[in-house]
Amino acid sequence: MKIAVLGGGIMGEAIVKSILRKKLAGREDIVISDVAKSRRDVLSTRYKVKVTEDNLAAVKGADVIVLAIKPQDFPILLGQLAGRLKSQLVISIAAGISLDGICSKLNYYKVVRAMPNTPAQVGKGMTAWTSAKDLSNKDREIAVSILAAMGEEQYFADEKYIDMATAISGSGPAYVFLFIEAMIDAGVHIGLPRNVATKLVIETILGSAEIMKKMAKHPAELKNMVTSPGGTTTDALLQLESGGLRSLMINAVAAAYNKAKSLGAK
């Protein structure tokens, strides 16, 4: 399987790394295009794959084309590809760009729209995806193999859920990192060395996520398991709730969702 990845940024690189790790394609069968010579040099050295600045050269002979560029650059890219596709599977990972927006400009319908996230860099990604209705079972299987190589994948028959997933899992790592940063700073504030605070926070986050995944309990129930009457945790939770953490998170996710929708409307 020959794969062209158009865009060698963080997510484009994560896809290439995942494909190689899962041995879905050999190094000689992957081409990455990127406008920045510095990125091409890095990717060529790091993964021993072919690189080019020419999108059309990259897609020549490809079985799968991954569109991993910024949403604002899509009009130019789709214009370059229009009329040049015959049987390739196209996978777009651009936020907010709808299937109809891609298919209509390409006049081509073997298209998957996906929203991975940055933990894909370490094989722990969460990718939401949908596809054009007439996509064959074979192409669907290829899409699943590539997306699952990055971690977990979730298919949605209704495309409206992709913008919602963008606001949760696509942008979500940034929310988590902000929370982690704040907890580390809090640890330093009360006297912990930063490296110790960092370890405590990271392991707490990882352990909490793992216990929720394995025990399959509602987060409120798990929270109550930590909270003793009159204890330290209840005082901390009172401050978080009084400060509006819950409503801030809801409003933040809603803002990201609205932004994702607006990108598709442009």
Predicted features and spans:
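Small-residue helix-packing motif on alpha-helices
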Residues: 30, 58, 193-200, 222, ...
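Rossmann-like NAD(P)(H) cofactor-binding subdomain of soluble oxidoreductases
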Residues: 37, 46-47, 55-60, 64-129, ...
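Internal alpha-helical scaffold of NAD(P)-dependent oxidoreductase catalytic cores
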Residues: 105-110, 126-164, 177-214
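NAD(P)-dependent Rossmann-like dehydrogenase/reductase catalytic/cofactor-binding core
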Residues: 202-266
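NAD(P)+-binding Rossmann beta1-loop-alpha1 motif at the extreme N-terminus of oxidoreductases
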Residues: 1-46, 50-53, 60, 105, ...
